[in-house]
């Protein structure tokens, strides 16, 4: 990854239980139904603490993002793809609003209300 120095980096995050008495092996971004923008912001730099990330340009230029890990194996992954499109090609997909669309999806189709944070752009935390 260091050799490739990607233009954009997207990490996943979740609500993985942590033991406060143990050091996390991999610090992650807190995301999901129980998270909020403040918590996502506080933990967003966690993955960047891994050795080598300081050598990459993407995090330094605002091209570092996080998405809810559990999108990987369910039909909601269409919302993750919407976020990826917006983050990778912001001009072409400026009219995409994954958080707004996921909220609307919950209102129309889910038996419970939307809560939490599922997409995080440290450069635009209010859009999370």
Q: PLM features: residue spans?
A:
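Binding-cleft/active-site segments that stabilize strongly anionic ligands or cofactors
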Residues: 1-76, 82, 99-104, 109-127
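Short, hydrophobic alpha-helical segments
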Residues: 85-92
